[in-house]
Amino acid sequence: MASGELACRYAALILSDDGIAITAEKIATIVKAANIKVESYWPALFAKLLEKRNVEDLILSVGSGGGAAPVAAAAPAGGAAAAAAPAVEEKKEEAKEESDDDMGFSLFD
């Protein structure tokens, strides 16, 4: 990760924490005050990204999407999703039945 990108992230967090509107000029001012050299496009890029989004919402939603993404990508559309769900449940039940039969008492199988 580039240090310029990280500096702009921190500057945006500082502005958001103080309740100040996030603009490219303000991000550049904070980065300049920290004596960090940043490419000129980073402050504008972050300002454009964050003008439509709330920083607090982004922070709160960081961990909420991790496990759901693979399931959503694998799920078929429409009525096929309902048909696929029972098939998955049946496979889980079969695995439980097999594991109940073999309790691990035979050491040399």
From Swiss-Prot:
HAMAP family, per the entry: Ribosomal_L12_arch
- Please describe the post-translational modifications of this protein: Phosphorylated.
The segment annotated Disordered runs over: 85-109
Describe the family membership recorded for this protein in Swiss-Prot or TrEMBL.
Answer: Belongs to the eukaryotic ribosomal protein P1/P2 family.
Query: What protein name applies here?
Result: Large ribosomal subunit protein P1
What is the gene called?
Answer: RPP1A
Name the domain of life: Eukaryota
**A Gene Ontology biological process term:** cytoplasmic translation
Q: How does it assemble?
A: P1 and P2 exist as dimers at the large ribosomal subunit.
